[in-house]
A protein has these predicted regions:
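The alpha-helix within a helix-turn-helix
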Residues: 23, 34, 60
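A short, Lys/Arg-rich alpha-helix, primarily the initiator
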Residues: 1-25
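Short C-terminal boundary/hinge segments that cap the last helix of small helical domains
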Residues: 64-74
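Short, basic-rich loop-to-helix N-cap that marks the start of a DNA-contacting helix
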Residues: 48-61
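Helix-turn-helix DNA-binding elements, focusing on the entry/boundary residues of the two helices
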Residues: 19, 30, 53-56
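Short alpha-helical DNA-recognition segment
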Residues: 26-43
Length: 74
């Protein structure tokens, strides 16, 4: 694995962790999240899916935060 690949994987895992924290803070299950957003979040939350920026924007909209707020502490 190259340095860039490691960095990309670490970034995906940080994004995944943040999404899961947001969801758990609102006490929302993955199933409820899917029903309300039509976004399958399980693979995103494990870092196994390279999330598109548009999907991340949809997730941020759902949690009523901006993309800049999402990345603020990362």
């Amino acid at each position: 694995m190259t340095k860039k690949q490691r960095y990309n994987k670490e970034l995906l895992l940080e994004i995944a962790k943040k999404i899961k924290q947001l969801r758990e803070k609102k006490n929302i299950s993955q199933d409820v999240f899917y029903i309300e957003t039509d976004i399958h979040i399980a693979r995103i939350e494990t870092g196994k899916l390279n999330i598109r920026i548009t999907t991340l924007q949809d997730i941020c909209d759902y949690f009523e935060i901006s993309l800049s707020e999402f990345f603020k502490d990362m």
